[in-house]
């Protein structure tokens, strides 16, 4: 998504989270999945977390930088549509496995993906199933300073904070799609997707005044 001209993404703990279209705020753009509007997982904003949907589940990304007349008029910035994997024209299978290690959290990371699709009954019935699992412990640390101006007009440091963040994100996603070709001009389609995400975050702060 970030490689598209006019699109910027906001990061959280090294992962892309929000998409901005044409420099507007993320809450001024709509995010849909297969054309269906996604609500925000946060109660006090319209921002939609793009990292809720794993990349293994997405086939294409459609971006409209201008809302057209056939779209909901609730997005000044534009629209981002995530298209999930559809049934293939022939049998296909793919599996991915990855791991890593985060030195700050001192924990291992795991990423698994599975996709299978095929057609049955003389290619009239198509099926696609996709499963994704990710467990990604991470961490970050920094030092933050606060300055003020004293009575002499001098800029002085009034506070220093040493912060550490330990984050574990676990994602589980399941996608299932069917289609049935009634004739060359008509097709029935059934799609479903289930996503589950957990975030655990520990914050530590030491303040010097």
Regions found by a protein language model. Give the residues of each.
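Outer-membrane beta-barrel pore domains and translocons
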Residues: 64-66, 83, 96-102, 132-134, ...
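Short acidic/polar hinge/loop motifs at secondary-structure boundaries
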Residues: 9, 19, 36-66
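Extracytoplasmic beta-strand/coil segments of soluble accessory domains associated
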Residues: 1-37, 65
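Residue-level detector of the transmembrane beta-barrel scaffold of outer-membrane proteins
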Residues: 30-32, 60, 92-96, 126-128, ...
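Transmembrane beta-barrel wall of Gram-negative outer-membrane proteins
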Residues: 107-206
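Outer-membrane beta-barrel domain signature
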Residues: 71, 101-103, 163-165
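N-terminal periplasmic accessory domains that precede
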Residues: 17-22, 32, 48-51, 63, ...
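Flexible, solvent-exposed coil segments and beta strand-coil junctions
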Residues: 42, 58, 89-97, 150-159, ...
